[in-house]
Every structure is written in structure tokens, then in C-alpha cells.
Amino acid sequence: MGMTMTQKILAAHANLPEVKAGQLIEANLDLVLANDITGPVAIHEIQRLKKKTVFDKDKIALVPDHFTPNKDIKSAEHCKCVREFAKEHDITNYFEIGEMGIEHALLPEKGLIVAGETCIGADSHTCTYGALGAFSTGVGSTDMGAGMITGKAWFKVPAAIKFILTGEPKEWVSGKDVILHIIGMIGVDGALYKSMEFVGAGIKNLTMDDRFTIANMAIEAGAKNGIFPVDDLTISYMKEHGAKPYTIYEADEDAEYEQIITINLSELEPTVAFPHLPENTKTVKEAGEVRIDQVVIGSCTNGRIGDLRIAAKVLEGRKVAKGMRAIVFPATQAIYLQAIEEGLIQTFIKAGCVVSTPTCGPCLGGHMGILAAGERAASTTNRNFVGRMGHVESEVYLCSPAVAAASAVTGKISEPSELFS
């Protein structure tokens, strides 16, 4: 029996001719990632073990992004811990305020992860890099710390679900709608510890930003990882971002999949996930009258330049509804600068939005947009669990940048087409 794309990458990194679903392996790592929340836990363990060196100072990335700019004394201490560790071990890829960004947008932008590589990060949305044809997955802080020391990690080889994408998305339908539709179809545990392997002619109709969004939320279906085949667009993206040499792996024709699901992109509609799980999806048309208090546009899921362009297109010449709060978070400093140069930030501010420096901030209920009891947010983030963005009695509705921007104008969950009819 042949291997899936994910299995081929893992076999190569375990120096094995082949692997099978369920097999336990030890794989070599190309990149190990930590942030200001998960990093200190690993760093303290490394210090406790009295380890003086890391496996490769060029293959570790440290990105303070969750509570930065520092929101309080405790977060400042966390960032100081990561900063001092980076200095002590001469870590090449430490990104300070002013250069940093939300980690899962920053690393591809910096060319630090490419097709065919294996990456672990102590953050569940590390699966984002599957958009580039890499195997990447989230792990706990101690596994990440061990990876920093040894350059290795053990995995159980995942079984796979194949998603055949066909057709072309309608206007205002994006990668966020695709992945919300899929999660709504299979559930938050529908791909538990499996690889979500996206294939099909429809992929050519998805931008890189769409693909990053889809791979990013694979974990919300319980997946070990999500992965896309490498095509001309992938290669162009990697070259544009000065990426290192890459390796292209392709699934065998006789690879085994536990399920094969076909999604016709042309049939999808703008979609929203109701509280308190990403699987609680409805089309916006089905949503009914859902009044909201706040809109968040940004995050590692939807804070890239394509996302901001779509939101600005909707907000151009319009105003945020009276009594509404709209917060925009470009995912990296480079994206922020590009958005300024393209006039997008001017559009947001004229519309009545507030624009923030890159941070994970409100997504995890950290800072910069916390919800009070009884408040509702339409958000382009990736999770809407109870209390995720603030008070346990608040509600989060997950949606695309287009829907979020339209909702900011109307004060309720809305389709952008309503504003252009």
C-alpha cells in the first residue's frame, strides 16, 4: 500500500523507506517554534535539565506574539524569559517587537518553513504551514523543549482523510468559508489525529491566503495536520519570500485514506460558526437576526494582506455602525506596512475601525478587545469556545473578513452582497 503526502514526509524525516498509519516513529525536525506563552515552560525545563546548548540555533524560532506589546507585568516577565534565552543561545530567529508578527503568518513570510519540511510548535495552529506542503503540527511545551535540545520528536503516523476540492468559489466566498463548511460537515472531532489532505482541481482557485486559512483551522476538526500539494503558486510564494531549498512530496496513487470527501467550492456560501464550537455552522443567509457588539478582523487565520484587502473593499466609503466596535489586526509588521502603502489602513480608520499592531490579543481573550458578559463578536479568528474572547457569558461568531466587515457596517451578522446590491 502506498503512502499519503504526510506519510512520505514523515518517512523521509524518520530515515525509513515507508511508514504506516499508527506506527510510532522518531523524526528529525527542520524547525521548532515557541511563543511568549508556551516558550517559558520549555525554557524552565531546559534550564532544570542544565542543558547548555540547543540542537541548532538556526532551526529554532521564538516569537513573542500572544501578549505583546506586553499587557501587564506577568506578560512582560514571560517575554523577558524568552528574550534572555534567545540571547543566551544566540537564537537566529528571535523576533522582537517591531519585527515580529503573529507567528503563523510570520514564519512563512520570513521563508523559515518550506515544502517537505517537518515542524513542531508549542501552539495548536502550527498546522498552518501545511499550506506550503510541509508537515507541521502543534505539540505541548515539554515536547517542544525536547525538540529544541535534540532536534527530534516522536509521532504516531496519522491516518488520512482526502478532501477533493472542485469548482471555483463565488464572490465573497473565501478559504474561511471552505474550512468552516468542512468542520460543520465532519465536526470538531471528525478528523481526530488524522491528516487532512487537500487535493483536486479546485485548489488552483484558492489563493495562498485561502490555503493558509484552511490549513490553520485543520486542528479545529481535531486533525494532526492539514496539507496541500505543492503547485506553481506555492513555489512562487516560497521564491517571493526568499525561502530556503524545498522538497516536493506527492501522495502515491494507491495511498490509503479512511475517508474521501468531495467539496464543490462553487456551491459554498458565506458561512458563520455559532457559539460555542466551530462545528456549529450556518450560512449567513440561515443565521437570522444576530446583533453584535464587536468585530475583529485579523489573527493567524485571517490577518494577511488578502484578508485586509477584502475587508477594506467592503468598508470603503462606509461607516462602522453606531455603537459597534471594529478592531483590525494586521498579522505582521510587513503586512501592516503594505496595508498602509495600499491605503487600506486609511480606509479602516475612516470607516471607524481601530487598527492594532500585530498581536494574538483578543483571539485568546488576552487583551486588545476583550468581551464583557452578554456581548457578541463576529470574528475572523479560529475558536469560539465558551469564554474564548472574554467573559464566559460572551459569544463569538466565526466568519470571514468579508462577512466581518459587512457585519461591522450593519451591526448584525451580514453578507457583504447586501451592501453591494
Swiss-Prot record:
Disulfide pattern: none
Documented EC number(s): 4.2.1.33
Annotated GO biological process: L-leucine biosynthetic process
InterPro entries hit by this protein: Acnase/IPM_dHydase_lsu_aba_1/3, Acoase/IPM_deHydtase_lsu_aba, Aconitase_4Fe-4S_BS, Aconitase_4Fe-4S_dom, HAcnase/IPMdehydase_lsu_prok, Homoacnase/IPMdehydase_lsu, IPM_dehydratase_rel_enz, IPMI_cat
Catalytic reaction annotation: (2R,3S)-3-isopropylmalate = (2S)-2-isopropylmalate
Family in the record: Belongs to the aconitase/IPM isomerase family. LeuC type 2 subfamily.
Descriptive protein name: 3-isopropylmalate dehydratase large subunit
Phylogenetic placement of the source organism: Bacteria, Bacillati, Bacillota, Clostridia, Lachnospirales
